[in-house]
Amino acid sequence: EEIAEELLDDVMKEDTWDIHDNLSFPLPVIIICEILGIPIDDIHKFKRWADATVEQMCSEDPQQFEKELSHMRDYLLDLILKKRKHNEDNTLLSRIAHSKINSNYLSDDEAVNLTVQIFVAGNETTTSLISNLVWRLMTIDNLWEDFVNDKIDINNAINESLRYDPPLLGLFKTTSKEVNIEGNIIP
């Protein structure tokens, strides 16, 4: 709430502003960076990396995003290795860095991949949710007025927005071992 209020305080000083660029984009990135314990100084870098990750999944030429993704992975690995050298702190990244399975740390790839997934999943979906919800509230008669006058429950508005304008239209999953589902083998 505090971060959203700070962002809104900044934009209220402007004559015009963009909901996506000034609120929907930075809010989830800042929050995720704070939860993970990643410095937010490079917020635009992280947004670019997150966008590249999503675009790569849908691209006919996924290799075009490899340079950006390599920079992100290197940056995150460096942070994870630094966290492993120091005592565990209260950040999620520290907990990932110090996580063990059978007395062994997660591999570097596992720790980086988990961090990327957390960052991308929380960022893209929340950015889209905020933008879609505000757009709907402002384009349907009287909804914005009802919303600002507390005639619309925020939780119901969010749930309806997720149902009507979902930020994600598909999920990609990979199995860790071969699975048989109703006679269909999934490698």
What are the language-model segments listed below?
Residues 1-187:
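Cytochrome P450
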